[in-house]
Swiss-Prot record:
Cofactor: Zn(2+)
Record text on activity regulation: Inhibited by wide spectrum metalloproteinase inhibitor batimastat (BB-94). Also inhibited by EDTA.
Pfam families recorded: Astacin
UniProt keyword terms in alphabetical order: Cell membrane, Cytoplasm, Cytoplasmic vesicle, Disulfide bond, Fertilization, Hydrolase, Membrane, Metal-binding, Metalloprotease, Protease, Signal, Zinc, Zymogen
Domain Peptidase M12A intervals: 85-282
Start-end of Low complexity biased regions: 318-329
Protein name: Astacin-like metalloendopeptidase
A GO molecular-function annotation: metalloendopeptidase activity
Phenotype upon gene inactivation: Absence of cortical granules exocytosis during post-fertilization. Multiple capacitated sperm binding to eggs and two-cell embryos are not prevented. Post-fertilization cleavage of ZP2 does not occur.
Function: Oocyte-specific oolemmal receptor involved in sperm and egg adhesion and fertilization. Plays a role in the polyspermy inhibition. Probably acts as a protease for the post-fertilization cleavage of ZP2. Cleaves the sperm-binding ZP2 at the surface of the zona pellucida after fertilization and cortical granule exocytosis, rendering the zona pellucida unable to support further sperm binding.
Biased composition (Polar residues): 340-355
UniProt region (Disordered), positions on chain: 318-356
C-alpha cells in the first residue's frame, strides 16, 4: 500500500501528459454535425439535467476500488496527500501576486467539447467575480493545474507544486458548474464541510448506513474550513446519501430535518468568505481597469463592482452561438447560470433558512445582470476565436519551438474586439510573465 501510494502522483502525471499530447481537436475545428450534437446529460437547450448522483456516487461508478485503503483517493474525491501534508493547514496556499491577486495557471485538455469548456469557464468566472482568485493561462509557470476528463471527479487539496491534476469527467459536468466549483475549492486548499472538527454540533453521521469499509471517509479533521461557521449550504458539503449502503441517509442535519445539503450550484456566502479570509483578499481589489469586488464584513453576500471579463466573454459566446449555429442546433440557447445567487451562509443554523426551491429554479441569465445585451461591444468575436480563447490546451514546455510564440489563449484574446468601457478582453491573461 505504501509503494502504491507513493506511485499515484507519478501515474497521474503521466496520464495527464498523455491526455494533453493526445487530446482531440477542439469543437471549433469540427465541421457541420459536430456543432449540432448535444453532450449526454444536457437538454437540447443546453441546460444541465439534474442527476441524483453526487461526487462519491460518480466516482464509485467510474473508479474500481474495494475500500478507501486501496484507493488513491480519500474522502471520495481528494488525491491522497503525503503524510506530512495532512498535518498542514496553510503552507499549501497559492501565492499572491502583484495587485493583490492570486493567479492559478491552468491547462485544459483538448478532449473537452465546447459546452464542457463553457461550464468550466463559468466556474472560473464565479471565483473571479467574488474573490481575488484569478485562473490564468499556463505559460511556462512552475506550478499549474492540469484539468483532464479522467475517470471521475477529483483533485488534490491546495498547491502541491509542479503540475497537479484535476479530473473532471463528462459526468462531473452534467449538473453544470457545481462540481467544478467543489474541486476548485479543493485546489485552493479547502476540505469537506462535513469533516470539520465541529461537525457533530450540526450533523449526525449515521455510521450503520455507511458502506462497510468506507467509514474512513467521515473522519473529522482540522482544516481551513474552520475560518467560518458551519455551513449546510456550502458547495463543499456532501449530500445526505454519501457512501450509503442501503439507500438510507448517512448524513443527517441536526438543526432542521428539511435543510438541503450537498448543493452543487453556487459558492455559498461562507464559501466566498473563507476564500477571501484564507487568501487575505482586500476589501476592494480593483484590476487594471478599476474593476473588482467588495467584501462585506457583516456576513452578507459579496457585491461585485462590475461583471467580470469572463462573464462578458461567456455572454458573447452565448449570443454568437445562437446566431451562427447550424440549422437544427439549439446549443446557442444555453442558459448560463447567473453569478451571485449564492445561498446565505449559516452563521447560526436555528435562525437561518435555506430554500430548496432556489436550487431547482433555472439559473438567472447573465443578460439580466447587465444593462447591455449579450455580446455587446464584441462585434468581431467569432465562435472559433472564443473557443480558442477559453483556455490554453497545449503546454508550451512540451513544444520548445513554440516558446517565442504567444500562447493560443493569449493570441486569441489579442485579436478580440475591445469590450465596453475600454476593457480589453483577457488583459489579466496577457500579463502572465513569460519564460
Amino acid at each position: 500500500m505504501g509503494i502504491m501510494g507513493s506511485l499515484w502522483p507519478w501515474i497521474l502525471t503521466m496520464l495527464s501528459l498523455l491526455g494533453l499530447s493526445m487530446g482531440a481537436p477542439s469543437a471549433s475545428r469540427c465541421s457541420g454535425v459536430c456543432s449540432t450534437s448535444v453532450p449526454e446529460g444536457f437538454t437540447p437547450e443546453g441546460s444541465p439535467v439534474f442527476q441524483d448522483k453526487d461526487i462519491p456516487a460518480i466516482n464509485q461508478g467510474l473508479i474500481s476500488e474495494e475500500t478507501p485503503e486501496s484507493s488513491f483517493l480519500v474522502e471520495g474525491d481528494i488525491i491522497r496527500p503525503s503524510p506530512f501534508r495532512l498535518l498542514s493547514v496553510t503552507n499549501n496556499k497559492w501565492p499572491k501576486g502583484v495587485g493583490g491577486f492570486v493567479e492559478i495557471p491552468f491547462l485544459l485538455s483538448r478532449k473537452y467539447d465546447e459546452l464542457s469548456r463553457r461550464v468550466i469557464m463559468d466556474a472560473f468566472a464565479e471565483f473571479e467575480r467574488f474573490t481575488c482568485i484569478r485562473f490564468v493561462a499556463y505559460h511556462g509557470q512552475r506550478d499549474f493545474v492540469s484539468i483532464l476528463p479522467m475517470a471521475g471527479c477529483f483533485s488534490g487539496v491546495g498547491r502541491s507544486g509542479g503540475m497537479q491534476v484535476v479530473s473532471l469527467a463528462p459526468t462531473c459536468l452534467r449538473k453544470g458548474r457545481g462540481i467544478v466549483l467543489h474541486e476548485l475549492m479543493h485546489v485552493l486548499g479547502f476540505w469537506h464541510e462535513h469533516s470539520r472538527a465541529d461537525r457533530d454540533r450540526y450533523i449526525q453521521v449515521n455510521w450503520n448506513e455507511i458502506l462497510p469499509g468506507f467509514e474512513i471517509n467521515f473522519i473529522k479533521s482540522r482544516s481551513t474550513n474552520m475560518l467560518v461557521p458551519y455551513d449546510y449550504s456550502s458547495v463543499m458539503h456532501y449530500g445526505r446519501f454519501a457512501f450509503s449502503w442501503r439507500g438510507q441517509p448517512t448524513i443527517i442535519p441536526l438543526w432542521t430535518s428539511s435543510v438541503h445539503i450537498g448543493q452543487r450550484w453556487n459558492l455559498s456566502t461562507s464559501d466566498i468568505t473563507r476564500v477571501c479570509r484564507l487568501y487575505n483578499c482586500s476589501r476592494s481589489v480593483p484590476d487594471s481597469h478599476g474593476r473588482g469586488f467588495e467584501a462585506q464584513s457583516d456576513g452578507s453576500s459579496l457585491t461585485p463592482a462590475s461583471i467580470s471579463r469572463l462573464q462578458r466573454l461567456l455572454e458573447a459566446l452565448s449570443e454568437e452561438s445562437g446566431s451562427s449555429a447550424p440549422s437544427g442546433s439549439r446549443t446557442g440557447g444555453q442558459s448560463i447560470a447567473g453569478l451571485g445567487n449564492s445561498q446565505q451562509g449559516w452563521e447560526h443554523p436555528p435562525q437561518s433558512t435555506f430554500s430548496v426551491g432556489a436550487l431547482a429554479r433555472p439559473p438567472q441569465m447573465l443578460a439580466d445582470a447587465s444593462k447591455s445585451g449579450p455580446g455587446a461591444g464584441a462585434d468581431s468575436l467569432s465562435l472559433e476565436q472564443f473557443q480558442l480563447a477559453q483556455a490554453p490546451t497545449v503546454p508550451l514546455a512540451l513544444f520548445p519551438e513554440a516558446r517565442d510564440k504567444p500562447a493560443p489563449i493569449q493570441d486569441a484574446f489579442e485579436r478580440l474586439a475591445p469590450l465596453p468601457g475600454g476593457c480589453a478582453p483577457g488583459s489579466h491573461i496577457r500579463e502572465v510573465p513569460r519564460d
